[in-house]
Amino acid sequence: MKFLCLHGAYGNIPAFRVQLGPMIDALEFDGSASFEFIQGRVSVVPPPGFESYFGPAPHYRFLKDRGEAEASAVEGIRVFPEAETPEDALRALMPRDDMEIGFADARGLALEQLYEALDADPEISGIIGYSEGASAAATLVYDEQERMRSEGYVPRIKAAIFFMGWPALTAENVPALSDEVENLLEVPSLHIVGANDPYKDGALALYNIFDDNMAVFFDSAGGHTIPRHGKLLQELVSAVKDLIADVPEDNSADLLAPAVTGKRLDSAVDIPNLSFLKNEDA
């Protein structure tokens, strides 16, 4: 399976290749997967004090806002709202009116680039996103499934891997939240989330919009970083291989079935125990 790879905010292709390097080496070694990287088209400058954190310039984003995110990204780490559910936390952090204005063009421009990448390489059938790149990747999955239901479009993305991340953006340029959307996303997905990630609720809200029977939760036992060493890396590679193996040859017909909302994750969830979640309702 060939994956389209999307870096995080203030990232670039060289930096993301390094971040994913150990996983890619293991998966390419035995031919399990191949990878195509694209770079965001929105040129940005890291927030003051974060220049070294994001590495050498240039820096890019996939989601274009109206200038507020540079401040909010830093402030969000310090004051991420406490709430009973990830969805409530996201609504408090990103009020709907602010999102509709601040991200008015973000979704359309990101989708334009991602569909161009799919058109340019017919072998791509999977997607990987890190942090903001996970939101952009999820936005593509969300749009493909909306188009499938409305116009019979056959989705290209058959599997998705999200490192941390945020929910997809809807046509209204607001986060797709599981307690607001009509349909969950029925695509095999792997969600890597760290218990110490300051943006954990964003990743949990992203996980919650995917069908429980097709989503796998992977505890990275860390923060907002990608596993790159030791046993955790081996387990990640194994999880990716399992994801690829579980993708049906043609799942377009299955996607037409209505989603059934199952167990969702709340903000107080004990992440180390989440690996057992998928088996509770089996």
From Swiss-Prot:
Reported uses of this protein in biotechnology and industry: Liamocins have high bioactivity against the pathogenic bacteria Streptococcus spp. and can be potential new specific inhibitors of oral streptococcal biofilms without affecting normal oral microflora. Liamocins are also able to inhibit human cancer cell lines such as breast cancer cell lines T47D and SK-BR3 or the cervical cancer cell line HeLa.
GO biological process, one term: secondary metabolic process
Entry EC number(s): 3.1.2.-
Entries under Pfam families matching the protein: FSH1
Phenotype on disruption: Completely abolishes the ability to produce any liamocins.
GO MF: hydrolase activity
Any GO CC annotation of this UniProt entry: cytoplasm
Expression induction or repression: Expression is induced by the cluster-specific transcription factor GAL1. Expression is also regulated by the cAMP-PKA and HOG1 signaling pathways via the transcriptional activator MSN2. Moreover, expression is also increased at low pH by the pH signaling transcription factor PACC.
List of catalytic residues: S131 (charge relay system)
Superkingdom of origin: Eukaryota
Keywords, alphabetical: Hydrolase
Family: Belongs to the LovG family.
Role: Esterase; part of the gene cluster that mediates the biosynthesis of liamocins, glycolipids (also called heavy oils) composed of a single mannitol or arabitol headgroup linked to either three, four or even six 3,5-dihydroxydecanoic ester tail-groups. Within the pathway, EST1 catalyzes ester bond formation between 3,5-dihydroxydecanoic acid (provided by the HR-PKS PKS1) and mannitol (provided by the mannitol-1-phosphate 5-dehydrogenase and the NADP-dependent mannitol dehydrogenase) or arabinol (provided by the L-arabinitol 4-dehydrogenase).
Name recorded for this polypeptide: Esterase 1
Origin organism lineage: Eukaryota, Fungi, Dikarya, Ascomycota, Pezizomycotina
